[in-house]
Amino acid sequence: MKDIDVVIFDIQDVGVRFYTYISTLHLVMEAVAENNKKLIILDRPNPNGHYIDGPILENNFKSFVGMHPIPIVHGMTIGELGIMINKEGWLKNKINCDLKVIPIENYDRNIIYDLPEKPSPNLPNKKSINLYPSLCLFEQTPISIGRGTEMQFQIIGNPD
């Protein structure tokens, strides 16, 4: 990172704790902080920003698919979450990231937001984004949630 002055983070999140883009943000923030660089987050609407739901992650269960003690559906934008990570001291050794968030214009979290582009090949539409917080809980079980089909996170079944 020696030849880098600033890192720009422009990735669409879906507002779910185990959607690993927020873990990637966390690791980027640590790398930027450790190298005394600046991070700019281009904030984006959260398609699940209109509600907060689910248990808060307990620290002894932290992993890449859950790094922060937040509810499953956290209601924050990626920029708000970056600010929270910084202010709560969740980065390694409680380091602080030189962070600037470019806010979203005219964003209202009470309005259900449809993403113009799919955030991931695994979340192809609004229905899959809406069902992801609940159906993803079955992902490490023998239950199928449509992975490898055109209806990922929209169907549930037993492959036997």
What are these regions (language model features)?
Residues 129-160:
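Internal helical hairpin/lid segments
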Residues 10-12, 42-45, 104-105:
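Active-site-proximal beta-strand/loop segments in catalytic clefts of secreted hydrolases
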Residues 14-25:
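Glycine/threonine-rich flexible loop motifs
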Residues 40-62:
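Glycine-rich, charge-decorated loop segments at or immediately adjacent to ligand/cofactor-binding or catalytic sites
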Residues 5-6:
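Structural motif
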Residues 62-134:
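Conserved anion/nucleotide-ligand pocket segment
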Residues 1-2:
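A short, aliphatic-rich alpha-helical micro-motif
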Residues 34-38:
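A short helix->loop->beta-strand "cap" motif at the edges of active sites that frequently abuts
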